[in-house]
């Protein structure tokens, strides 16, 4: 599930959004002339204005990244386009509309129910993944990320759509990631603290045990934001397990001699993804790594989990572009 701003907040980071909603204790019983009242109101007001300003900066950064990604990569004669579920994708769709081209012959493939609603609300034609004609390859797919490392490996699944996001990316010639600068880190699990994993409800308890054996610290089934004792369900009617691990090594780290095989809970990105995927009951893992679309095509495949490029909106209004190795 997504928040009104388009981002999922798990129980682990939920307290960070409640600061501005706190009321000042005893405010109604204080006299208007009390210095304490004016001080509290001033601090609260300043905090609110600051947070509002920062939120506005982040949204403008997302808009800039979305526009740049579409301007540089959108095929003008596209027949099928994947549209992801990240909060930045709102601005990707906006940028597609702003191109001013004929989109009547283009079908847009959503990665979830909210993504589909976004497509339809923009006046574009949505087609579900399972309704695609056999053998259809998407011209391109755009999606966001919860975190991106130096090698363009991604963590996704904060919005509980990771399985559909992955199959759409794997069916596209190119996958483009769009995010704001906060999502770019040198290693995965630096700022974003857990890996989302989609699991069969009947196997959830066993998956939690297996994740602990792999080194996860307190993995947990994600609950609904508005019902803390009810597990969140994906569009596939599966659960999401959020599994914290130590920050993940890159291939470059392993090449210089660091051990990412899981000893002492230290993993390299792809090694951990493969280990989790082998757990019975796991549908898919919120780690996107491995080949890009062009790399997969060179080997006879269709698409890849890794984006060919990632666009990051910066606080100053500029856009930073990272490209995957050829």
What are these regions (language model features)?
Residues 14, 38, 47-141, 146-153:
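N-terminal glycine-/serine-/threonine-rich phosphate-binding loop
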Residues 27, 75-78, 99-102, 291-303:
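Alpha-helix termini
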Residues 33:
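Short polybasic linear motifs
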Residues 55-64, 117-326:
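Conserved phosphate- and dinucleotide-binding cores of soluble alpha/beta proteins
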């Amino acid at each position: 599930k997504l928040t009104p701003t388009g981002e999922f907040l798990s129980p682990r980071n939920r307290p960070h959004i409640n600061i501005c909603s706190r009321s000042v204790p005893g405010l109604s019983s204080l006299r208007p002339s009390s210095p304490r009242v004016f001080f509290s109101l001033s601090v609260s007001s300043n905090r609110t204005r600051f947070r509002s300003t920062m939120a506005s900066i982040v949204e403008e950064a997302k808009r800039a990244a979305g526009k740049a990604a579409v301007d540089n990569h959108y095929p003008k004669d596209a027949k099928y386009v994947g549209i992801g579920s990240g909060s930045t994708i709102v601005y990707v769709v906006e940028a597609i509309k702003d191109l001013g081209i004929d989109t009547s012959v283009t079908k847009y493939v959503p990665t979830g129910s909210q993504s589909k609603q976004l497509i339809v609300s923009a006046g574009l034609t949505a087609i579900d993944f399972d309704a695609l004609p056999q053998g259809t390859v998407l011209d391109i797919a755009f999606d966001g990320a919860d975190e991106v490392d130096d090698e363009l490996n991604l963590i996704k699944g904060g919005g509980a759509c990771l399985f559909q996001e992955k199959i759409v990316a794997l069916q596209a010639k190119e996958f483009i990631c769009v995010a704001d600068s906060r999502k770019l880190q040198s290693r995965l699990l630096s700022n974003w603290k857990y890996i989302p994993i989609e699991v069969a409800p009947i196997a959830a308890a066993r998956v939690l045990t297996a994740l602990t054996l792999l080194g996860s610290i307190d993995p947990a089934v994600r609950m609904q934001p508005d019902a803390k004792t009810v597990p969140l369900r994906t569009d596939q009617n599966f659960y999401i397990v959020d599994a914290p691990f130590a920050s993940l090594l890159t291939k470059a780290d392993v090449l210089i001699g660091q051990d990412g095989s899981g000893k002492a809970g230290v993993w390299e990105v792809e090694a951990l993804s493969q280990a989790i995927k082998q757990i019975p009951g796991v549908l898919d893992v919120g780690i996107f790594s491995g080949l890009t679309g062009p790399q997969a095509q060179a080997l006879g495949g269709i698409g890849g989990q890794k984006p060919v490029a990632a666009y990051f909106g910066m606080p100053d209004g500029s856009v930073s572009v990272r490209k995957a190795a050829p």
